[in-house]
Amino acid sequence: MINSNQMSRSHLPEVQKPRGPQTNWSEHAKALESSSSVTKFLSSNVLYALESQKPRDMAARSIAFPSVNVHTLAHPQISKAWRALSSLSVNNTYLRPGVTPPIDVGTNDSYSARERSTAKVISSTGGSVYSSTRPNLSAMNVSGTGRSFHSFPSSVPGDDKIVAEKFPRGNNEIRESEPSCTHLNGVEKSFGNSAFPAEQFESRKACLDDMDDDDILENIDVDQIVMEHYHSTSTPQPSVSNFSLRTPPVDRSASRLEEECNLPPELCSNCSHGIKLGLCPEASTHVEQMKDVLLAISNELLDDATDLSPDRVGQLRQERLRLKKQIQQLENHIRDKESQKSQFLSSTATRIFQYETPKSTNYKMDQPQTDFRAHVSDQGRYACDSWNTPRDSSFSVDRYGLSSAPVEREQYVPKIIDVTYTEGSNDKKWSSREFPWTRKLEVNNKKVFGNHSFRPNQREIINATMSGSDVFVLMPTGGGKSLTYQLPALICGGITLVISPLVSLIQDQIMNLLQANIPAASLSAGMEWAEQLKIFQELNSEHSKYKLLYVTPEKVAKSDSLLRHLENLNSRGLLARFVIDEAHCVSQWGHDFRPDYQSLGILKQKFPNIPVLALTATATASVKEDVVQALGLVNCVVFRQSFNRPNLWYSVVPKTKKCLEDIDKFIKENHFDECGIIYCLSRMDCEKVSERLQEFGHKAAFYHGSMEPEQRAFIQTQWSKDEINIICATVAFGMGINKPDVRFVIHHSLPKSIEGYHQECGRAGRDGQRSSCVLYYGYGDYIRVKHMISQGGVDQSPMATGYNRVASSGRLLETNTENLLRMVRYCENEVECRRFLQLVHLGEKFDSTNCKKTCDNCCSSQSLIDKDVTLITRQLVELVKQTGERFSSAHILEVYRGSLNQMVKKHRHETLQFHGAGKHLSKIEVSRILHYLVTEDILVEDVRKSDMYGSVSSLLQVNNAKATILFSGSQTIVMKFPSSVKVLKPSKQGATAAKGPLTSEKQSTLPLTTEDAPPKDVNLSANMYTALRKLRTALVKEAPDGVMAYHIFINSTLQQISRRIPRTKEELLEINGLGKAKVSKYGDQLLETIETTVNEYYGTNKKDSIISNDSPDSGKRRRDENISPNVAEDDDFEVSPSQSCKKTVRNKSNEVLHGECIDGDRRGMELDFDFKDEDGSEIRPEGRVLPW
């Protein structure tokens, strides 16, 4: 039998895991030989191994101790049993059922001579003192087992302090204190390890004298107690209540009244359901409705500001401010209720009983008799002399020595502010060159970054942020956003903090900066603490070497240590500015909303005098306002730039069964051995497309979210280093891409929305060179995507997370379906300019004449006419009703055109009124009209999956509300169709790409701005470009991990070198993209490669006669003398289409494997020889040009 002291010890963690006791049956038998000791032994230490060995009264009982309801036992019985257990003096050293230690005849004498320790717990809550007495286990060894026990105090309630003290065994003093009780369903139960007042002790002693061992054993299951002790010594367990728990009754009316009284004034108004807004169960729906109203008010203020009266503007602003406050209060209220609910659920057991989890305890244990010392600091973290724990890690420790989760700081709640916007794009003061830093900007832009001019709005943005203004920037992908904060960070003192959403983006930016010798560092959650500590120490130094510090939004939201270091930097005047990259992630209405981004408003709250620069490439007016509010930018200068990407060529191609053959043909004829992305709908599609392209001879790989992170990183690295050319990916391959020389983006399947399509196409041509965006469209993909949307299986915004995702599923499905239908309308539109369709959707006005035939519709030579199809649409709607709304659009099409196939005859649809009514129309025309009815929501497609085969099908149904309007005669439907009169095509360059796969002739519709140059110099430039690419590949292999090819030289830089043929380092500095740091690192290798290539081309014996390199001045004079009058104008040369096509066949046999360049690069380089500077202006021949 086990005494109470040993029971209490079972709930404490052990410092050293004990070994199991040895079998000692021989000692057991030896003890039983003496008849005098049998009785004593049986009454104290025997555990019966077999049922037959138990006394009669015990053998009949079940091993499991039956649970006793608290209401079935009288309180005196409970107290009597507990007092008996608490005062037992018999010691039991059993550690495993059926095994006992050797019997020491002199146990009682030696035991009484040992020291006993008393644990005194001083409670901070009740002020009472509890103490208990037990053996000093640190000095006690159980003979025969080799086990030793360290001294630990008994487990008692209390949060403040436990101190282990020693008292001699002979000291029987009991301190006066209040007994410790736990309240459970109205029953008070005293803890067994508590000391009692002396007067109570005497009564207990008298009670125990009246009880013998048999009475105790009849009421106690020794087997069960020993089993619990055995399990508890292996793993610390929380104490379990023996009584079933009940939830006390709650007065709901009183609770509701209290909640109503605590509501803020904004939530006390009644909603549409007639109850207070804060108490409505549909509060989340009201939030969305109020956001819609707020969006409408904001759009009215933005779009109709000039037409509104001052009173109306004032009313709208007041209403907008009221709605903002109401939305904020309601969202906070919903969040608080959800948090309370989640905390309640996490603290509620799933069974009918529940573990009683003790409160977290910050304690300190001092035990001089042991070598190991564990301390818990005031912050609740373990601290040991040999441990080096991070300061950011905050843990609480419970009574069992287990650390809980990190303690989160209070969530930041943004404040409603009144924002004053200033349009900066047309403000001439920001473009002024009178600022004191203008000279430094221009010098460092050329010297460090290798740029000879600024791109549009770059200078203006830099001037605004360096003037101390908060700036919001809308700039398209590839517009040069990074320079707007990297250049100011270089010339200004202090640290620029950059918040970027992905670690891969951060690493890419840092690699670029290190190549330019600009010191930068990053902090992320995945870094080792030693690395973070080193960075923090550098930030704290008097002269920190870092200019930029990159962090993720999660780091700002959760790291108190980072905020402390920022405060330190600010106090020393070394905090320059905050930069928020991908700022649209702040907005709940943005397509990439991330909750941690909303916590970034704390930066402006803590550091109001530090300017903020927010950058994004995708933001509507509502998203912009939401971002500015969340970040707390009171006086905000806004810079806008067109989303139009002139270097991208858009096309929509019909998707056929030979789609993969068409893709192979397009790549080989237009972008052979160039880098590209193919976006697919599913993982299976990615693998299938990749495998097929490999069979066609392309260096391709697949990438999707189901791959292991290491495997995905390896594939992306291979692609970034040009070891593979084509990556077939789902949209999981997204924001982390910063490769500038992506020449094509192909969509193998239909995108989910126009926003997503525009963003994915934006990954092509970031270097400003001509690139292709091709979408293969089939209506079957629409059915697949719609089904996956309805099942929640498709999310083409991989980072679209946050609590807005828990909004009404019906509303979310409706929004996603509408976005998908807009994408279908975009694909089905064969008339309007592709750029116009995209930019209008994004809220930008665009003149289609500026497209300059860089999309398939503008290149089309078809003559189109308008046709009234109202009667046809009515017939089709009526036909859907007649078929019972249970058939697909394909079946309706067959019936309408008069088909007599098996399906039509099976359902007797040949007898319907409108069977054959459209036999004069082609399948394409009827299909277009049906799709139009679906996109206009007159017909609705019910997409479902077959249970038998798993295939996806859609059934057409009628939207009665819209159909009523159509049949009323108030709606006329007009569509454009090709004219029956064919017009003569002006040239092959005008061929349309909307009717079939693109070919080299169709691709040649891209504008050619320069005349052809003499063939021999084209060949020299092509040879030079190939040699330079091989040099770049070698440099990448020698560079550290993480350095990509475009970090060293981008393709446009290599093309400029190939065209100009610089022969000195001074001439290399004239190349756009080559700064002083890169010329110092790679200049000698570049010049050596150039020299070798020129010698091979002209021959070593002609070197002195053709090209003289005596001095830079003589080279310049010869260059000026040998340039013909037309060379300066025609320096941006490129090869003719016929010439490049002839080389395509030869290129297929000249491929070099293992990352080497191929002769096919000549053709790719020639097609891109319409060079332009980064600011859009043509590059003039400032370098060396060879004579003909």
From Swiss-Prot:
Record Gene3D superfamilies:
HRDC domain (1.10.150.80), P-loop containing nucleotide triphosphate hydrolases (3.40.50.300), Winged helix-like DNA-binding domain superfamily/Winged helix DNA-binding domain (1.10.10.10)
Inducing or repressing factors: By cold. Repressed by abscisic acid (ABA).
The EC category is isomerase
Which cofactor is recorded for it? Mg(2+); Mn(2+)
According to the UniProt entry, where does the motif DEAH box sit in this chain? 581-584
Query: A GO molecular function for this record?
Result: ATP hydrolysis activity
Q: Pfam families, per this entry?
A: DEAD (PF00270), Helicase_C (PF00271), HRDC (PF00570), RecQ_Zn_bind (PF16124), RQC (PF09382)
Name of the protein described by the UniProt record: ATP-dependent DNA helicase Q-like 4A
Organism lineage reads as: Eukaryota, Viridiplantae, Streptophyta, Embryophyta, Tracheophyta
